[in-house]
């Protein structure tokens, strides 16, 4: 069984193929560069770019795997959550391919695919497992009974951790996206230079808006307001702020996990999302938890279609399918309580 996956939830246009053994045989990602000058994603530009490059991205994936569309047995596409226009482009393109090839199609949840990405590359995972999604748009903690069954334990009440990194990068005068740049600067900084505190939200939820504001005041001064311009910072200041902020942000997440592991007798940890690629974060989690940890490779941390194809294949084989696939911008947290949220 050969599954072709498509991803277009934000600014990456991606196509991948996964074979009958869940092995990735092609993984092509086109990253849009037009948004850099705007300091963030412009939804209309993203949608137009998806429309323009999807045909060539699919052709590249087929060429890489040495197959044709007629060889595809199943199509999988991201249908939620994400930018509604971008999702609509991907869903309609995938539907056209499926109808033309007279093959089945299945919708995949982008957040749940991030959770599945680490499982794809793991040799064996012991369950129940703790699942952690840390990306630019979502931050959430799940209890996983198996790869397709889980419940939501906690999530960010405001900004996602990746979004917070990008906003702090903007405060520092760094280009978008800024998460990887902060990680690089932090290596040369002192993480105790600024007394940024980790989140103190009770329970298993998270919050990053307070930390973001603390960084802003550390840069502009406590008596500043929204009209106060951002000052020029020295290289050492940028390094120290990056290191101190990074420590506080990741400690906010890591400090929640030991109690969850103990309460639910978790036997492993699966981490997904672009922020999972941060080496400081990986090291912190390894030092915090005494259990097997699974991170996706760099190519599967960021948005990609391999995780969409992989999870789509699992869902299809498990018969977790409904008749319709409709783009939906928001993640339905309330549906993540027993099993994978039903496809609309």
Curated annotation (Swiss-Prot):
EC number: 2.3.1.234
Enzyme class: transferase
Matching CDD domains: ASKHA_NBD_TsaD_bac (cd24133)
One protein family per Pfam: TsaD
GO terms under cellular component: cytoplasm
Keywords (A to Z) from UniProt: Acyltransferase, Cytoplasm, Iron, Metal-binding, Transferase, tRNA processing
UniProt xrefs under PANTHER family: TRNA N6-ADENOSINE THREONYLCARBAMOYLTRANSFERASE (PTHR11735), TRNA N6-ADENOSINE THREONYLCARBAMOYLTRANSFERASE, MITOCHONDRIAL (PTHR11735:SF6)
The protein, known as: tRNA N6-adenosine threonylcarbamoyltransferase
The species this protein was found in: Chlamydia abortus (strain DSM 27085 / S26/3)
């Amino acid at each position: 069984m050969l599954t072709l996956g498509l991803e277009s939830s934000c600014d990456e246009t991606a196509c991948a193929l996964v074979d009958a053994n869940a092995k990735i045989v092609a993984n092509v990602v086109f990253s849009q560069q037009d948004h850099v000058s705007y300091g963030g994603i412009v939804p209309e530009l993203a949608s137009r770019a998806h429309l323009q490059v999807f045909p060539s991205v699919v052709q590249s994936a087929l060429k890489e795997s040495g197959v044709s569309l007629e060889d595809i047995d199943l199509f999988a596409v991201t249908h939620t959550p994400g930018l509604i226009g971008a999702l609509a482009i991907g869903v309609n393109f995938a539907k056209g391919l499926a109808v033309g090839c007279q093959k089945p199609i299945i919708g995949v949840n982008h957040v749940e695919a991030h959770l599945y990405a680490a499982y794809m590359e793991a040799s064996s995972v012991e369950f129940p497992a703790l699942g952690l999604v840390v990306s630019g748009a979502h931050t959430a903690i799940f209890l996983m009974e198996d790869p397709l069954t889980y419940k939501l334990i906690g999530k960010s009440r405001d900004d996602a951790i990746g979004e917070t990194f990008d906003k702090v990068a903007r405060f520092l005068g760094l280009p978008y996206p800024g998460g990887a740049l902060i990680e690089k600067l932090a290596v040369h900084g002192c993480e105790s230079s600024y007394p940024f505190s980790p989140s103190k939200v009770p329970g298993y939820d998270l919050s990053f808006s307070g930390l973001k504001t603390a960084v802003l005041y550390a840069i502009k001064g406590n008596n500043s307001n929204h009209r106060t311009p951002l000052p020029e910072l020295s290289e050492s200041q940028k390094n120290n702020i990056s290191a101190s902020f990074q420590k506080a942000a990741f400690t906010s997440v890591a400090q929640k996990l030991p109690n969850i592991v103990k309460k639910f007798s978790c036997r492993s940890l699966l981490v997904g999302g672009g922020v999972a690629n941060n080496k400081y974060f990986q090291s912190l989690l390894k030092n915090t938890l005494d259990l097997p940890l699974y991170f996706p490779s760099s190519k599967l941390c960021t948005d990609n279609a391999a995780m969409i194809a992989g999870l789509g294949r699992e869902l299809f084989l498990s018969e977790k399918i409904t008749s319709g696939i409709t783009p939906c911008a928001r993640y339905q947290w309330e549906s993540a309580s027993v099993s994978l949220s039903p496809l609309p």
